[in-house]
Amino acid sequence: MVAATDRTSMFPADVDAITRTAQRYFEGTSYLWGGVTPWGADCSGLVQSVFALHGIDLPRDAWQQARAGSDAGRDLLATRAGDLLFFSDRADGHVTHVAISLGSRRVVHLALGRGGYALERLDDASDEYVRKLEARFLFARAVL
């Protein structure tokens, strides 16, 4: 697990509070590569900022975040709320995207393909973007 920092965080470091922050604080955020604020962020910026608000330090980039915490498996059905989900659109499997699991195959993330903030149901077979995202899933990490 990733340790909370010794500075006072704005919010409690529990899964319900973290998933609420991810859904509410960043709702409407536009995609901005390298951004870390509700006025513009990318996928890993969202993850880093949300967890930082709760006193949990994570690295900046998705590929670095993929090394944080502990293995939570490769089965989307088994992921729990608060887990980080990692994806790749590269043949070599290098991590290129991260999302926060809300449980029950739901995620919150910032995606260029969605123009920014998005809540997704990864079992929505009618949505082409979701089908592609699900096919790109690599693994999950537990950081709580």
Predicted features by range, described:
Residues 6-8, 36, 72, 96, ...:
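Aromatic- and glycine-rich peptidoglycan recognition patches
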Residues 87-90:
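Short, surface-exposed secondary-structure boundary micro-motifs
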Residues 1-24:
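Boundary regions of SH3-family modules and the immediately adjacent low-complexity/disordered segments
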